[in-house]
Amino acid sequence: LHRRRHSFPTRRSSDLVPSHGAESVLTTIAEAGSLLQPEPDYRPDVVSFVSAPLEKALPICGQIKVHLNVSTDVDDTAFTAKLMEVFPDGRAYNIRGGITTIAADLPEGQTYTPGQTAKVCVEMWDMNWTVQPGSCLRLDVSSSDFPQYAVHSNYAGVWSEQEKTRIAHQKILLGEGSFVELPLHEN
């Protein structure tokens, strides 16, 4: 996947990245399922990566994982990932999405030091999708996907117990260690 940019701020809780097309939205049926997505990098807090067009069909069957080397200026934060198929005419539809936190991916008992590199893995629900020849894959990374996922306060601790929020500045470190793991199905 080709990089467009690799750092982004989180937003205040009044300006979150909205869920648009999702597999676990319980608040409104209008946003559920695979829906037409906005353009790549449509907000300053969304980083998009786009592949070259595929020469042949790509059957995906199972759990998609997005491995990222990241850093932030706070002691915990969330990272979301949304994988999409971009058709030759430019229309993009979400395939799957997921979320994780830095704390969730640390070994038991360890804490994150702001500014250090951390490895996170966004694990998505199992699925079956065939990306068509001529289409591209697009991955959007952010720190919110609301209301599909609860708002992260950018403080360490249990999300639901936090009384305040703050803006975090995220970085995705490209190269070895940051990649998308696709479960491919051979016909």
Regions found by a protein language model. Name each.
Residues 1-2, 6-13:
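Short, small-residue-biased leader/transition segments that mark boundaries at the very start
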Residues 11-187:
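Glycine/threonine-rich phosphate-binding loop and adjacent beta-strand/alpha-helix elements that clamp
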